Design a protein with these regions (language model features):
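Short, well-ordered alpha-helical segments
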Residues: 12-16
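Conserved catalytic/coupling modules of large nucleotide/cofactor-utilizing molecular machines
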Residues: 17-152
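Hydrophobic "lid/gating" helix adjacent to the active-site nucleophile
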Residues: 5-8
Length: 152
């Protein structure tokens, strides 16, 4: 599982399910039959696309949290459960992603104001990450245009 998560990552997300399935098969059948599931998994993992971009992104995000410490949650993301919270601006201008065109509120950020916007995940040109990069590049361009249209 560690090899799958760190070394293959989102280049081939199916590999994680396959690793869990091989483990489950071995647990159910034992040796020697269950070993065949691991053998097939090893062959698959050895021959599939590799990427540690997700792993690197996770580590960078953790490093930023360690460095910056606890930051304030942006007001628009705070739950306005009481009248006082509403008066303080909690939840103001919050955009529900599910209601936005395309399912993503493009001009909304989830980062604390003190941190500013960050990009952690930079997909590599291998496996499924090729498509993920195309999608993220498109979303980032659309986000920039949406923010420019609102003067942000």
């Amino acid at each position: 599982m560690l090899f799958r998560s760190e070394d293959i990552g989102l280049a081939d997300p199916r590999a994680q399910s396959m690793a869990l399935e091989a483990w489950d098969i071995y647990e159910r059948l034992g040796s020697p039959e269950g070993e065949l599931a691991f053998a097939q998994l090893v062959l698959y993992l050895a021959s599939t696309a590799k990427s540690n971009a997700g792993y690197a992104a996770f580590n960078q995000a953790k490093a930023d949290v360690r460095e910056s410490g606890t930051e304030e949650v942006p007001l628009h993301l705070r739950n306005a459960a009481t009248k006082l919270m509403k008066e303080l601006g909690y939840g103001a201008e919050y955009q529900y992603d599910h209601d936005a065109e395309g399912g993503i509120a493009l001009d909304q950020t989830g980062f604390p104001d003190a941190m500013g916007e960050r990009v952690y995940y930079n997909p590599v040109p291998r496996g499924l990450e090729i498509k993920l990069k195309e999608k993220l590049d498109r979303l980032r361009a659309e986000r920039e245009a949406a923010r420019a249209a609102k003067g942000r």
